[in-house]
């Protein structure tokens, strides 16, 4: 199984956050980051990357 690097995770999170922001606004994306104790993608704990990506991805494809 291939593991994404932290840089790959951050790039995916940032791209997905941009898509989610187009649909729901910056406040919705900020809410997701705040749930994980961050104000932006760079402030996230790497252990939360997959969870944050999953939430943002769901928003972006709704």
Predicted regions and their residues:
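Interfaces that engage single-stranded nucleic acids at replication/repair/recombination sites
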Residues: 1-62
């Amino acid at each position: 199984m291939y593991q994404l690097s932290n840089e790959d995770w951050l790039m995916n999170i940032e791209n997905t956050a941009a898509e989610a922001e187009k649909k729901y606004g910056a406040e919705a994306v900020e809410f997701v980051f705040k749930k994980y104790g961050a104000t932006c993608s760079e402030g996230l704990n790497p252990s939360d990357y997959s969870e944050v990506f999953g939430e943002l991805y769901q928003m972006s494809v709704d």
